[in-house]
Structure formats: C-alpha cells, structure tokens
UniProtKB/Swiss-Prot annotation:
Protein's job: Catalyzes the two-electron reduction of biliverdin IX-alpha at the C15 methine bridge.
InterPro entries xref list: DiHydbiliverdin_OxRdtase, Ferredoxin-dep_bilin_Rdtase
HAMAP family: PebA
Any GO BP: phytochromobilin biosynthetic process
Keyword Nucleus: no
Species: Prochlorococcus marinus (strain MIT 9303)
GO molecular function, one term: cobalt ion binding
Protein name stated in the entry: 15,16-dihydrobiliverdin:ferredoxin oxidoreductase
Lineage: Bacteria, Bacillati, Cyanobacteriota, Cyanophyceae, Synechococcales
Family membership: Belongs to the HY2 family.
Keywords: Oxidoreductase
Length: 249
C-alpha cells in the first residue's frame, strides 16, 4: 500500500543530497514469521538535518505502516517533519497524520513557519486536522494545521498520495527558506527542545504496543529508545497520562 510513498520519500531525500547512515545493530530489520510481518528502517544524513529516520512495517492485509520524522540541525529552529500512515487492509481503513511538528507553540513561531502548511490545509479541506486534535495535547508537538486523513481505499489511493507529495514539497521549501536566514531560537535551546520532543514522544508512543505485539517487548523497547527516540534516555521526566491513536475497530 505505502511502497510508492516510501519510494517518493526516499527519492526526495536523495535529491536533497541525502545519504543512508547506519542503523543500530539489530534494528534495521525484524521479522515475525508467524504473523507474516516485517519492519525495515532507514537513517539518512541530509544536509541541514542532524537526523532523518524512516520505518516501514508490512504485515500483509492485517496492517501497513509508514512512519518518518526529520530533525533539523540545531542551528535551524524550524519544526520537525512527522508523518504516520496506517492502513488496515482487512477493514479497508486508513489513518494518516502529516504535520510540521512545532518546537514551541509561540504565536510568532507559528506565524513564521506554518504559512505553507496553512495553505495545504486550505488546499485539502478533506484533510483538516480538527478531529484528530482531540486525541493529542494541542499545546505540545502538533500544529493546528496538521493534515489528518481517515477513510477507505478511495482516500488511500486518491487523496493521500497527492497530499503526501504536496506535503513533502512544502517542507523542503520551508527548509530552503530557513537555511538562508538566521534562527531566532539559539542552537542550545533548539537542542533541548528536540530532546524534550523525544522524551515526550517515547512516553506516549502509540505504536510501541503494536510493535511489541509483532516483535516482542525486548526488541520493541530497543527500537523505541535507540532508533525512534534516542534522546529519550538522556534525561528524566515525570510519566504523563497515556495517549493513543483512535484506531479503527
């Protein structure tokens, strides 16, 4: 289901000068023969970014997942890029979230970085994020203009690919703009904000239970803290209330 989008993502990264980097030992790929599930992951070194990760889970008709997060260099205070695409083939259900994830919720910060995403939401009104914002804390790492898609095969094959391509193009444009001007948030503060993002996300990651069910707790714990959110082990924080996707039933 998501292989064409995965190739589009990787192609766009290569065009921007990206090169693959080493994934921690044992985390590049994991397979569960009994459940016929396979997860593969990539790390990219991209000019202007300190880290760009991509993961693809293929569990046949049961579940398809494409996930990616891009972390800009600390001297660039632009939002992270985050996307989560899930397809439940047996139920013909799609859940997709695409967002520029803000480091802070300051009004001037949002005005400076989110004009492009605002325009995309106007261009794709069927992907308004109003519904999904009930599932997450809007005062943290989600923007008011995230693109949210829930539907069946028609949205998966029509609306999503077009929005996905436009979303990537918009983020690259934002990065090019920010690369030409000084960041307003000091690099040391951006670093702390990105660490806080990893901590926050690791504590609430809705996919951790899913990965555990397919690949076991030991592997999934390593995947969470060594690949998905590696900065989450570098500081302590108080456990928050759990959050989860509103997945199809």
């Amino acid at each position: 289901m998501f292989d064409p989008l995965l190739e589009k993502l990787h192609s766009s990264i290569r065009i921007q000068g990206g090169e693959t980097a080493a994934v921690p030992d044992g985390l590049r790929e994991c397979r569960n023969e009994k459940k016929n599930s396979l997860i593969r992951s990539w790390l990219w070194q991209v000019p202007g970014f300190r880290r760009w990760r991509v993961s693809r889970l293929d569990a046949g008709e049961s579940l398809q997942v494409l996930n990616s997060v891009a972390y800009p260099n600390y001297n660039i205070d632009q939002p992270l890029m985050g996307l989560d695409l899930l397809w439940f083939g047996k139920r013909q259900k799609l859940v997709a979230i695409l967002d520029f994830q803000p480091l802070i919720q300051d009004h001037s910060y949002l005005e400076r970085h989110f004009q492009g995403l605002k325009a995309l939401q106007n261009r794709f009104p069927e992907l308004s994020g109003e519904e999904t914002m009930r599932l997450f804390d809007p005062n943290q790492y989600f923007s008011p203009w995230l693109l949210f898609c829930r539907g069946g095969a028609e949205k998966a094959t029509n609306s999503l690919p077009e929005a996905f391509n436009a979303f990537l193009h918009c983020y690259w444009e934002l990065h090019q703009q920010n690369s030409k001007k000084a960041s307003l948030i000091p690099a040391a503060e951006v670093k702390q904000l990105q660490i806080a993002y990893d901590i926050y996300s690791a504590e609430r990651d809705p996919a951790h239970g899913l990965f555990t069910s397919h690949f076991g707790k030991a592997w999934s714990d390593r995947f969470l803290h060594e690949f998905l959110f590696p900065a989450s082990t570098k500081a302590d924080s108080s456990p928050p209330a759990d959050a989860d996707y509103d997945l199809p039933r």
